[in-house]
UniProtKB/Swiss-Prot annotation:
Lineage of source species: Eukaryota, Metazoa, Chordata, Craniata, Vertebrata
Predominant location: nucleus
One record GO biological process: RNA polymerase II preinitiation complex assembly
Family note: Belongs to the Mediator complex subunit 19 family.
GO molecular function, one term: transcription coregulator activity
Composition bias type Low complexity, residue spans: 234-244
GO cellular-component term (any): nucleoplasm
Subunit details: Component of the Mediator complex, which is composed of MED1, MED4, MED6, MED7, MED8, MED9, MED10, MED11, MED12, MED13, MED13L, MED14, MED15, MED16, MED17, MED18, MED19, MED20, MED21, MED22, MED23, MED24, MED25, MED26, MED27, MED29, MED30, MED31, CCNC, CDK8 and CDC2L6/CDK11. The MED12, MED13, CCNC and CDK8 subunits form a distinct module termed the CDK8 module. Mediator containing the CDK8 module is less active than Mediator lacking this module in supporting transcriptional activation.
InterPro entries: Mediator_Med19_met (IPR019403)
Keywords from the UniProt entry: Activator, Nucleus, Phosphoprotein, Transcription, Transcription regulation
Protein name: Mediator of RNA polymerase II transcription subunit 19
Function of the protein: Component of the Mediator complex, a coactivator involved in the regulated transcription of nearly all RNA polymerase II-dependent genes. Mediator functions as a bridge to convey information from gene-specific regulatory proteins to the basal RNA polymerase II transcription machinery. Mediator is recruited to promoters by direct interactions with regulatory proteins and serves as a scaffold for the assembly of a functional preinitiation complex with RNA polymerase II and the general transcription factors.
Modification Phosphoserine occurs at: 194, 226
Disulphide bonds in the chain: none
Amino acid sequence: MENFTALFGAQADPPPPPTALGFGPGKPPPPPPPPAGGGPGTAPPPTAATAPPGADKSGAGCGPFYLMRELPGSTELTGSTNLITHYNLEQAYNKFCGKKVKEKLSNFLPDLPGMIDLPGSHDNSSLRSLIEKPPILSSSFNPITGTMLAGFRLHTGPLPEQCRLMHIQPPKKKNKHKHKQSRTQDPVPPETPSDSDHKKKKKKKEEDPDRKRKKKEKKKKKNRHSPDHPGMGSSQASSSSSLR
């Protein structure tokens, strides 16, 4: 102990209270513990304040788990349950998804010509037949000469008679409405003898030449008395001169 004090010196004095330094009153000492018997003057320990029924429980001090929500209720449907068996759809599933449909080769190659579903040995179109019996071809490609190209050129000239009327469209025929003819026509009432006699009399009156002549004379008289008639002014002038 003497060696320790010789090395580090004597123990320093404790720091003075804040009142001695001029910073105001210091921290009060802790209260003494209550007696074991618990007399009438002792107060009960402080408890957490109960929140009103309408207030939010998250803000109130409800213990260490006041921020956690209530756990969801237990449900029958979970991720591990088989929905097909739960809803009794096993028969429908086996009916539509259990059978294996045989698909043809033409379903995968719809753009290829010919009979695709037949084997290639029938029409000699397999790869083996091409390897064993290659087609006969020339050794090299020869360009087309000018005389051969002349057969594909278009030359100006008159059109043949067969092709002259090809651009003219034929007139469209007016199709009669068949549905109108197919409709049931109303039956025409039979003519009575009195109606036929009346029609005959009307025709005779219209064909009478004297009546036509009378109509023409009436029209002429009306035209003479009308102011638009050209001879009206001269007749009025002659009548006025005779009166003088």
